[in-house]
Amino acid sequence: MAENLAALRFTRRYGASLEEVWQVLTDPASISRWLGPPADVDARMRTVEPGRVLELDWTRRGEGGSLVRLELAPDGAGTVLVLDHSRLEARVCMGYFGFWTPRLDRFGAELREGRR
């Protein structure tokens, strides 16, 4: 039922080049540090536009399928990352706010660590 679906958007600016951000976003070792173990999520690539867009079909046990889209844009000497998590069941939407917020914080820490 479309009326019961929700979406979240997170926008973060990082003081790193688009290439550095893309590397941390797509490198398996980096992913395991900022996103954590796969747990009960099945994430399958839907769209990849290197250096710009990564879109995933996201399915978590006990939930309907949803869509995660990460989009990058250069911003001066840094990069803006926009993460949209859409087609979420309303009952799980706020749980994903708590899921993505610390992971995006760890993503920023992973970028800073790589720049040292």
What kind of region is each of these model predictions?
Residues 1-3, 54, 115:
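Positively charged, low-complexity terminal tracts
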Residues 1-37:
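Hydrophobic ligand-binding cavity/cleft-lining segments
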Residues 22-25, 58, 99-100:
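Tryptophan-centric aromatic hotspots in well-structured domains and transmembrane helices
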Residues 26-27, 51, 106, 113:
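A very general structural signal that marks isolated residues within well-ordered alpha-helical segments
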Residues 32-89, 93, 98:
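Hydrophobic-ligand binding "helix-grip"
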Residues 87-116:
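A conserved amphipathic terminal alpha-helix motif
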